[in-house]
Amino acid sequence: MANNWLNNRKRRPTHPGEVLREDVLPAAGLTQDKLAKLLGVSRRTVSEILHERRPVTTDMAHRLARAFGTSPEMWLGLQQDVDLWDTHHARRKEYEKIKRVPAPKAA
């Protein structure tokens, strides 16, 4: 089943904001204000990401990757896992009603 990891996982994947808040910023000695200036975005944008109220977009992933020597894919991968989890759990019953299309028969 394609969604097996979503069904078997006991908790929501870690939001990239939590990674920034708990690991990256303390290690770098950065505050929200300093990070906002470094990234060229508003403090509100940074705060909303750190408090998991805003997703990491492709633009923000590039900014974070540049600032911390990582890749945009790393940040987007974290966000994608959260997005898939949230959507799956919010709409699981709806998705269960969708019938699978049978595989084509071999010629």
For the regions a protein language model found, what residue spans apply to each?
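Intrinsically disordered, low-complexity and often Lys/Arg-enriched segments
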Residues: 1-8, 102-107
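A short, Lys/Arg-rich alpha-helix, primarily the initiator
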Residues: 5-30, 77
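Hydrophobic side chains within well-formed alpha-helices
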Residues: 16, 71-72
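The alpha-helix within a helix-turn-helix
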Residues: 25, 36, 65
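Short alpha-helical DNA-recognition segment
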Residues: 30-48
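The DNA-recognition helices of helix-turn-helix-type DNA-binding domains
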Residues: 42, 53, 68, 79-82
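Short, basic-rich loop-to-helix N-cap that marks the start of a DNA-contacting helix
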Residues: 53-66
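Short, charged recognition helix plus adjacent turn
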Residues: 76-107
